[in-house]
């Protein structure tokens, strides 16, 4: 599956911004049919960084959200800066 079709956009809120700083995690809205393995591979292909784990949930609006924990220190901040979140 194409990595660009799996990861749709970053999920931005006060909670996700705190996770970027405190827990080295970044949150994205992803394709509903994607599983954790596909999300992990797509993220590693797009951003060239090692993923420790992926947690997913479906929001009441029907969007699938993936919280991705990164291995390297401050990697979430670097990716957020590249995406223009800050």
Swiss-Prot record:
BP terms from Gene Ontology: translation
A single GO CC term, please?
Answer: ribonucleoprotein complex
Name the source's superkingdom.
Archaea
Q: Which GO terms describe its molecular function?
A: rRNA binding; structural constituent of ribosome
UniProt xrefs under InterPro entries: Nucleotide-bd_a/b_plait_sf (IPR012677), Ribosomal_uL23 (IPR019985), Ribosomal_uL23-like (IPR013025), Ribosomal_uL23/eL15/eS24_sf (IPR012678)
Q: Which UniProt keywords apply?
A: Ribonucleoprotein, Ribosomal protein, RNA-binding, rRNA-binding
A Pfam short name: Ribosomal_L23
Would I find Cell division among this entry's keywords? no
Family named by the database record: Belongs to the universal ribosomal protein uL23 family.
What does the subunit comment say?
A: Part of the 50S ribosomal subunit. Contacts protein L29.
Q: What does this protein do?
A: Binds to 23S rRNA. One of the proteins that surrounds the polypeptide exit tunnel on the outside of the ribosome.
Which NCBIfam families does the UniProt record give? PRK14548.1, uL23_arch
What protein name is recorded for this chain?
A: Large ribosomal subunit protein uL23
Q: Which gene encodes it?
A: rpl23
């Amino acid at each position: 599956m194409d990595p660009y079709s799996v990861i749709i956009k970053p999920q931005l809120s006060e909670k996700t911004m705190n996770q970027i700083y405190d827990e080295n995690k970044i949150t994205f809205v992803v394709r509903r049919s994607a599983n954790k393995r596909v999300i992990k591979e797509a993220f590693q292909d797009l951003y060239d960084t090692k993923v420790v784990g992926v947690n997913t949930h479906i929001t009441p609006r029907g969007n699938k959200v993936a919280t991705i924990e990164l291995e390297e220190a401050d990697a979430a901040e670097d990716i957020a800066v590249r995406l223009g979140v800050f």
